[in-house]
Amino acid sequence: RFLQAVIISCDAVMRYAKRYAVLAKEMAAKESNAARKAELLTIARNCERVPAKGATSFHEACQSFWFVQQLLQLESSGHSISPGRFYQYMYPYYKKDLDNGTLTREFAQELMDCIWVKLNDLNKCRDAASAEGFAGYSLFQNLIVGGQNEDGRDVTNDLSFMCITASEHVFLP
């Protein structure tokens, strides 16, 4: 039964992502601004790929991260879920794309700024009494931006600083 539950959950995640892909395509079909249309088509391609087939780029990894973060929040009602060492698990995608010229630091920062805005959107369904006291407050996200690995080596990287910059750019709690 456990494995059946895992399969059901994974299938649901893939259907969830596909719905975003469909919506992005529909929005692109109605869009008159060429730049925005291209952006929506990229979003659609990313949503068709991740998380089902795994990310191959920083942009896809950001989208996959966001889907997983949303669904974890939904499953746990926002309790004890945070991005943790985001800068570590996202770095290989960032570095590869930067090195092969498919990503600029500026666009990577824009994607991270967008994630920071979305992280601030997260909230939870509350009972009436709790809603009165907590309405409008985001869940807050704990995120580590530097540190050491198990050998004591500094593993701070560009994304560590870009996380801090994202906080400065969006200026949200």
Residue ranges and their predicted role:
Residues 1-37:
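N-terminal leader/propeptide and maturation segments of large enzyme subunits in energy/redox metabolism
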Residues 1-6, 35-42, 46-173:
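Conserved catalytic cores of very large enzyme subunits
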